[in-house]
Amino acid sequence: MSAAALKNDVFLRALLRQPVPYTPIWLMRQAGRYLPEYNATRARAGSFMGLAQNPDYAAEVTLQPLARYDLDAAILFSDILTVPHAMGLGLDFAPGEGPRFARPLRTEDDVARLAVPDMESLRYVFDAVAVIRRELDGKVPLIGFAGSPWTIACYMVEGRGSDDYRLIKTMLYARPDLLHRILEVNAQATLQYLNAQIQAGAQAVMLFDSWGGVLADGLFQQFSLAYTRKVVAGLIREHQGRRVPAIVFTKGGGQWLEAIAACGCDAIGLDWTVNLGQARQRTGDAVALQGNLDPMTLFGGSEAIRAEARRTLDAFGPVGTGGHVFNLGHGISQYTPPEAVAELVDEVHTYSRALHAK
């Protein structure tokens, strides 16, 4: 595919800690249920999986927030559980319940049968990447993503989201050998999956370690970060003549920033509990930082949104040799008023231009 020249590469340059005229912004879950147009497309698709597995629908919803807002990146519309679904675990989205697996990994035999899926079974994802790149026509970069080996293992063992992670933590303490096997398969599958996204046209990739923060210190390094590092180490880092930056986001991972920064990634995503300035001091500008507004700020009205945006930018401080991509500290709430996002994007761009000019 001969890709259109990138018209706005501020996001990619910020991830690589290169000079930029303003702080770029995109939002986790920016294509989602807070947008009426997303809900209309999902209704046409019939279900979440009907949306995610149809490249044209996936492209349509990926591009919707960019039609509304002056965002600096698009992120592929998909789900972190597509990989275990391709492994045969039977993903289903029950109304009001979230994702669940029909065949979770509970026994030694279940784990023994687990294998890296044929990437052709995920062709719909790579086709969506190609369609989105074509339709973006170089407007902004496209981010590909996957769940971290640990985070998808949580769903694969629990069978659904969990409050206490009892089943996977039972396996971790009682049969760590089984969990390590799951994580090894997940790491290989995730690496192949992200590299296929890059080959299809993703210009940056992000690993979502959404549940890394539920692990005890020491166990996080052993069961989450070690496998994240394996994925990052194998990523294609140059494609179509450009560096492909890698972002790692561990929700609740603030105490491990130094270790995460050393995993080989270009940028760390931060949740809203972390002070950006302190995170920057602790990582010494070795990586860019992404984040980290509390998503609930978007319910506070124009004045609060703009004040918190400025506070977040000020916390990072003068960019200098660092890199900052503005984002939320977690995914945007489905109840967010769409006009709140317009206020946020405007304030980040306007205020950061003045900061970058200093």
UniProtKB/Swiss-Prot annotation:
The keyword Lyase applies. GO terms for molecular function: uroporphyrinogen decarboxylase activity. The record marks 79 as: Transition state stabilizer. Substrate binds at residues 29-33, 79, 155, 210, 330. Pathway: Porphyrin-containing compound metabolism; protoporphyrin-IX biosynthesis; coproporphyrinogen-III from 5-aminolevulinate: step 4/4. It is found in: Cytoplasm. One of its GO terms (biological process) is protoporphyrinogen IX biosynthetic process from glutamate. Pfam families: URO-D. Its EC number is 4.1.1.37. Its main location: cytoplasm. It comes from the Bacteria. PROSITE patterns: UROD_1, UROD_2. It catalyses: uroporphyrinogen III + 4 H(+) = coproporphyrinogen III + 4 CO2. It is an enzyme of class 4 (lyase). Signal peptide: none annotated. GO terms for cellular component: cytosol. Catalyzes the decarboxylation of four acetate groups of uroporphyrinogen-III to yield coproporphyrinogen-III. Belongs to the uroporphyrinogen decarboxylase family. NCBIfam families: hemE (TIGR01464). Homodimer. PANTHER family: METHYLTETRAHYDROFOLATE:HOMOCYSTEINE METHYLTRANSFERASE RELATED, UROPORPHYRINOGEN DECARBOXYLASE. This is Uroporphyrinogen decarboxylase. The gene is hemE.
